[in-house]
Amino acid sequence: MSLFANKTLMITGGTGSFGNAVLNRFLQTDIGEIRIFSRDEKKQDDMRHEFQAKMPEVAEKIKFYIGDVRDLASVKNAMHGVDYIFHAAALKQVPSCEFFPIEAVKTNVLGTENVLTAAIEAGVKNIVCLSTDKAAYPVNAMGTSKAMMEKVIVAKSRTVAPEKTKICCTRYGNVMCSRGSVIPLWVEQIKAGNPITITEPSMTRFIMSLEEAVDLVLFAFENGVSGDILVQKAPACTIETLAKAVTGLFAPAHEIKVIGIRHGEKMYETLLTNEECANAIDLGNFYRVPSDKRDLNYDKYFKEGDIERNVLTEFNSNNTDLLNVEQVKEKLLSLTYIRDELAAWKK
């Protein structure tokens, strides 16, 4: 954590699952201060009490700022003295954004513009923004707003020297057991004795843990070039496989009920499009997609010719490694939430 020694890190949307995971990872390191910026005072108060109870010796490193990324003044107020930012604030529920698309634009697009504008003015050195696989070939309002967020990030990266402020983006799939995700819903349905509800058995989704989400952001922080999009080579599984893995751990004979696809959902998700794969750089467990550095003076590019392109096809949840039930169970058992719920269930 030497890059963070005595530094101030700001997390927008910091009371969510990602912010909690970062606090658990960072608080006992040599980081100077972590600023939690969010609009929900109750969640901030809950987080304050939680970390004062479990990490009293370092809890004073957490500073809380109430504000909204939609409000530039509140963002600027929290930005003074910040070295680094993890931008996680977002509206991310697909069905909700279908009914309130302009709200998704206000938070995910205009809110990101506010964060980046304030950060550049304040001299923040490194910003990592969190996006989603739903931004690739988007069919819903949430994904479309995140795709526009990524365009804002790339455009902003062109306006500031990277040695002054580096801005890059991570894109990932479903984070298991994060707030609002399906696995905690299923666990509650099992505990209540109700059938677990799935949308479409053959639907596929990328899966990763919160720890892997933090790892991806840290990889982007250390290795990304301004304007980059970085993704992890995540595995995937069908919704049916995930449901059978969860019921297999808790109640093998539990009923699974198919309820149909919700508003705005896709049968499979894409982490990298064909067009992005043409320029992607393979970094082992990750792909790096550099931004297009050309300007609007196209005449010189017509004269110089096209650049060399990769032959990769799109990277999606159908053509990545598809895990079976036992492999998904193994991933689930690596999660503290699942282990704790199983222990309580078996009492």
Regions found by a protein language model. Name each.
Residues 87, 91-151, 155:
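Conserved Rossmann-fold NAD(P)-dependent oxidoreductase catalytic core, especially the SDR/UDP-sugar
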Residues 38, 65-66, 106, 200, ...:
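Conserved residues in the N-terminal Rossmann fold of short-chain dehydrogenase/reductase
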Residues 12, 79-88, 129:
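Rossmann-fold scaffold of SDR-type NAD(P)-dependent oxidoreductases
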Residues 3, 121, 151, 155-177, ...:
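Strand-loop microenvironment adjacent to phosphate/nucleotide-handling motifs in alpha/beta enzyme folds
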Residues 30-43:
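Conserved glycine-rich Rossmann-like NAD(P)H-binding loop of the short-chain dehydrogenase/reductase
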Residues 64, 104, 167-170:
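Hydrophobic/aromatic anchor residues within beta-strands of the central parallel beta-sheet
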Residues 8-29:
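N-terminal Rossmann NAD(P)H-binding glycine-rich loop of SDR-like oxidoreductase domains
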Residues 63-84:
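Conserved Rossmann-fold cofactor-binding substructure of NAD(P)-dependent oxidoreductases
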